[in-house]
């Protein structure tokens, strides 16, 4: 095990605070509508230009071990806020820096760090309650567009695209972001359920122009095993042929004789069928087959449920108004499932989302809810260059997270105004002793900081603006984009309550840990040993008999 350097007290804290300041100073220049850009070096290709706080934070790694520990703790604030609320990373970093800076003054003057932390926690809890009180629900398309625009650094086209997407697929629908092929942003909406499996043979295509197989009013056969013997399928095929309707078969795989027979029947026009592999793998495949069954009003033919292919009847098959099968995707439109059953299934999957531990599982479950409840929208981001595309795509993703947060918990006045208003709940607070009161004061001062930074980045005098905004009431604030004092909500400058709340809570949590740190342990830098000398010269013939 490598030797460690142990540093105590002020020496440890001051070094860590230096790291906090280096990271925060690089991140906070991006805050607000007039925030500046930061250029990030890439080991391959050109540099990335960004105004996204968390992207800047993630790039920072400092040489000094203690400074780096401080920087990493604040990086945690940014990434945690980004994970929970999807935005507010720069605000969280600015708040954390301010709480640490003010707190260090009190710690240096001999106050008890634990009591300071208790005061900070008490103030933050009161501020969060106040934010919830002043929050208003975000329901209209206009409000959703405003939240998206602000989060995307005042880009109204992004906000409008997101609002349009949410309008089409509903609040629960899946909205994904992809690279576009043109200069303009585009929105593609897929109604119904789509999964990423296409036809098993191009001979199933019946619409050569679009290269898709279209089935109108088809039956849907769902099976969880491989099908290779046509005898297994014959009873069902005969019943479907009598009904005179097309058939979509979704199974683990369809191969050999079974696939060949289906293709021949299709070409001859005897029976219109399309065979598709089941989506997903393992347990997720079973769950998705069950989803499709509920959506189409059918049953999965599986041994576990006591059903076999040979004995399957039309009653076990699902139905839909229309199904389109492409090379890579299958879309089921207007399944015949009962609305009550679909709702019950959505509830069940939502309960699993609550219990999910990994982000990946949560994302996949969320996709399943969307496919059952609404549809899928794809925002294709257009830009002139690769660098611009990356930067814009990151902003669209941020804005998307922010709008979801706004729909979830509502909105408050943006531009740092909500935090100024929430200070009223803290002003009357008192702690158990003078040190706790100092902790409350630290938070009071920190809650001005986002507004100060927004104004500073806009090139104005921060103290004057903070005093003017604090003297006002309600949504009265300073719109840095226009340099005017306005009603922030009417002007469309709003923040999701969840973003503001999460930023404050995460900042206070990490800053409190830093203030109560009294020792730091870091690995000593390794000294590289000098290279050993070369091999000695040849030994020559030593006259040894072999």
Curated annotation (Swiss-Prot):
Entry GO MF terms: ATP binding; ATP-dependent protein folding chaperone; isomerase activity; unfolded protein binding
Residues binding ATP, per UniProt: 30-33, 51, 87-91, 415, 479-481, 495
Reactions this protein catalyses: ATP + H2O + a folded polypeptide = ADP + phosphate + an unfolded polypeptide
GO biological process terms held by the UniProt record: protein refolding
Keywords in alphabetical order: ATP-binding, Chaperone, Cytoplasm, Isomerase, Nucleotide-binding
UniProt biased composition (Gly residues): 534-546
GO annotations of cellular component type: cytoplasm
SUPFAM superfamilies: GroEL apical domain-like, GroEL equatorial domain-like, GroEL-intermediate domain like
EC assignment: 5.6.1.7
Enzyme class: isomerase
Subcellular location: Cytoplasm
InterPro entries given in the database record: Chaperonin_Cpn60_CS, Cpn60/GroEL, Cpn60/GroEL/TCP-1, GroEL-like_apical_dom_sf, GROEL-like_equatorial_sf, TCP-1-like_intermed_sf
Region (Disordered): 526-546
This protein's record includes keyword Isomerase: yes
Job description of the protein: Together with its co-chaperonin GroES, plays an essential role in assisting protein folding. The GroEL-GroES system forms a nano-cage that allows encapsulation of the non-native substrate proteins and provides a physical environment optimized to promote and accelerate protein folding.
NCBIfam families named among the record's database cross-references: GroEL, PRK00013.1, PRK12849.1, PRK12850.1, PRK12851.1
Family: Belongs to the chaperonin (HSP60) family.
Self-association state and partner proteins as the record states: Forms a cylinder of 14 subunits composed of two heptameric rings stacked back-to-back. Interacts with the co-chaperonin GroES.
Name assigned to this protein: Chaperonin GroEL 2
């Amino acid at each position: 095990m490598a030797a460690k350097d142990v540093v105590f007290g002020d020496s440890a804290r001051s070094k860590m605070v230096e790291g906090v300041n280096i990271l925060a100073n690089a991140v906070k220049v991006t805050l607000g509508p007039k925030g500046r850009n930061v250029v990030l070096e890439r080991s391959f290709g050109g540099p990335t230009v960004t105004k996204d706080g968390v992207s800047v934070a993630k790039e920072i790694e400092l040489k000094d071990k203690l400074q780096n520990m401080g920087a990493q703790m604040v990086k945690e604030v940014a990434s945690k806020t980004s994970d929970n609320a999807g935005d507010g990373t720069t605000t969280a970093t600015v708040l954390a820096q301010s709480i640490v800076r003010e707190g260090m003054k009190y710690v240096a003057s001999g106050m008890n760090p634990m009591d300071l932390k208790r005061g900070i926690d008490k103030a933050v809890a009161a501020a969060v309650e106040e934010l919830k009180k002043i929050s208003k629900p975000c329901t209209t398309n206009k409000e959703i567009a405003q939240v998206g625009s602000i989060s995307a650094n005042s880009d109204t086209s992004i906000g409008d695209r997101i609002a349009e997407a949410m309008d089409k697929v509903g609040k629960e629908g899946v909205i994904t972001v992809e690279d576009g092929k043109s200069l303009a942003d585009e929105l593609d909406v897929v109604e119904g359920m789509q999964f990423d499996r296409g036809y098993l043979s191009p001979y199933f295509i019946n619409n050569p122009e679009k290269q898709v197989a279209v089935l109108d009013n088809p039956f849907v056969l769902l099976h969880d095993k491989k099908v290779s013997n046509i005898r297994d399928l014959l009873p069902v095929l005969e019943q479907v042929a009598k009904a005179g309707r097309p058939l979509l078969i979704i199974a683990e795989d369809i191969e050999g004789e079974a696939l060949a027979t289906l293709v021949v029947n299709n070409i001859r026009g005897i029976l219109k069928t399309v065979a598709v592999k089941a989506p997903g793998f393992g347990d997720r495949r079973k769950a998705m087959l069950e989803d499709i069954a509920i959506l189409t009003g059918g049953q999965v033919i599986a041994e576990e449920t006591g059903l076999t292919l040979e004995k399957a009847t039309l009653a076990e098959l699902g139905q839909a108004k229309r199904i389109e099968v492409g090379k890579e995707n299958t879309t089921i439109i207007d399944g015949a499932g009962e609305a009550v059953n679909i709702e019950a299934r959505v509830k069940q999957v939502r309960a699993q989302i609550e219990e999910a531990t990994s982000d990946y599982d949560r994302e996949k479950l969320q996709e399943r809810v969307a496919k059952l409840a609404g549809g899928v929208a794809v925002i294709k981001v257009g830009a002139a260059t690769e660098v611009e595309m990356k930067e814009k795509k990151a902003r669209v993703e941020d804005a998307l997270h922010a709008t979801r947060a706004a729909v979830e918990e509502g909105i408050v006045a943006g531009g740092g105004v909500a935090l100024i208003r929430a200070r009223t709940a803290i002003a009357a607070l008192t702690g158990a002793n003078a040190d706790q009161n100092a902790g409350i004061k630290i938070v009071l001062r920190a809650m001005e900081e986002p507004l100060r930074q927004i104004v500073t980045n806009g090139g104005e005098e921060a103290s004057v603006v903070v005093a003017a905004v604090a003297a006002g009431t309600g949504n009265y604030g300073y719109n840095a984009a226009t340099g005017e004092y306005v009603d922030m909500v009417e002007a469309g400058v709003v923040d999701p309550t969840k973003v503001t709340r999460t930023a404050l809570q995460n900042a206070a949590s990490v800053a409190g840990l830093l203030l109560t740190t009294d020792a730091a342990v870091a690995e000593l830098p390794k000294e590289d040993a000098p290279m050993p000398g070369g091999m000695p010269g040849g030994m020559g013939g030593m006259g040894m008999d072999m």
